[in-house]
Each structure stands twice: as structure tokens, then as C-alpha cells.
């Protein structure tokens, strides 16, 4: 079991370094136990094969062996940083890009990253 857990931790670290938009949390317990649930980082329990959205704008899925969480937020990177600024709207889980001098005017964005 320790070897499996160690492998999952190494895999999760590798995935995080390659693609920081998702991460995995090992789901400890006995495989095949259908009464098992996943416990998220806040201590909430979720049924196996369920999906939920976190307060941090992530969507998480409970699997038998792990919880997989991925960001819902795309970050603007291709915009005029001298004249525009990005503002995060947590209630919508998205960024908007507006002019610094007149925040009522939006700026065009050519590139986004997840």
C-alpha cells in the first residue's frame, strides 16, 4: 500500500509540474468498497463517481482511488499590460480585462492559459 501511495504522490507531483491546472488527492480505503466516499480538502465527503465545484473555482471528481480537481479558470495573458488590467470575478470563476484609465471599457485578449 505504501508503494502505491508513494507512486501516486510522485505521479501527482509530476502532473502538477507539467500541468498546474489539475491535481490529484489519493483516496485511501479498500478498493471495491461501494460504501466508501471521498473526503475533499475541507473535510466534506462525496460519493464515488460524483462531481462538484469548489469555492476556489475548481471542478473535482471522486473516483475509487483518487479525487481529481481541475481549475475552471482561464487566465488572460495576451493583452496590453501597459494600458489594461485583469480583474478576477470569483462569482463567475473568470477574469475580465479592462482599461486601467476607464474600467468600464474592456480590452481585447488574444491568448488565455488554463
Swiss-Prot record:
Record's keyword terms, sorted: Disulfide bond, Secreted, Signal
Organism: Homo sapiens
Coiled-coil stretches: none
Main location: secreted
Signal sequence, renumbered to the chain: 1-20
This protein's encoding gene: MSMB
UniProt entry tagged with the keyword Kinase: no
Disulfide partners: 22-70, 38-62, 57-93, 60-69, 84-107
Record: disease: Prostate cancer, hereditary, 13: A condition associated with familial predisposition to cancer of the prostate. Most prostate cancers are adenocarcinomas that develop in the acini of the prostatic ducts. Other rare histopathologic types of prostate cancer that occur in approximately 5% of patients include small cell carcinoma, mucinous carcinoma, prostatic ductal carcinoma, transitional cell carcinoma, squamous cell carcinoma, basal cell carcinoma, adenoid cystic carcinoma (basaloid), signet-ring cell carcinoma and neuroendocrine carcinoma.
Tissues of expression: Strongly expressed in prostate, liver, kidney, breast and penis. Also expressed in pancreas, esophagus, stomach, deodenum, colon, trachea, lung, salivary glands and fallopian tube. PSP94 is expressed in lung and breast, whereas PSP57 is found in kidney and bladder.
Note from the entry: Specific receptors for this protein are found on spermatozoa and in the prostate.
PANTHER family linked: BETA-MICROSEMINOPROTEIN
Stored Gene3D superfamilies: 2.20.25.590, Complement Module, domain 1
Name of protein: Beta-microseminoprotein
An example Gene Ontology CC term for this record: extracellular space
Classification lineage: Eukaryota, Metazoa, Chordata, Craniata, Vertebrata
Subcellular location: Secreted
Recorded family membership: Belongs to the beta-microseminoprotein family.
Any single Pfam family the record assigns to this protein: PSP94
Quaternary organization: Homodimer; Interacts with PI16.
Amino acid at each position: 500500500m505504501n508503494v502505491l501511495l508513494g507512486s501516486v504522490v510522485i505521479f501527482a507531483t509530476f502532473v502538477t509540474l507539467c500541468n498546474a491546472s489539475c491535481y490529484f488527492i489519493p483516496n485511501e480505503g479498500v478498493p471495491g468498497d461501494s460504501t466508501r466516499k471521498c473526503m475533499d480538502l475541507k473535510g466534506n465527503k462525496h460519493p464515488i463517481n460524483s462531481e462538484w465545484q469548489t469555492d476556489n473555482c475548481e471542478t473535482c471528481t471522486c473516483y475509487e482511488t483518487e479525487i481529481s480537481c481541475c481549475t475552471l479558470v482561464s487566465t488572460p495573458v495576451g493583452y496590453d499590460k501597459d494600458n489594461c488590467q485583469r480583474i478576477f470575478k470569483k462569482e463567475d470563476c473568470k477574469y475580465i480585462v479592462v482599461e486601467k484609465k476607464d474600467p468600464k471599457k474592456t480590452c481585447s485578449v488574444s491568448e488565455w492559459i488554463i
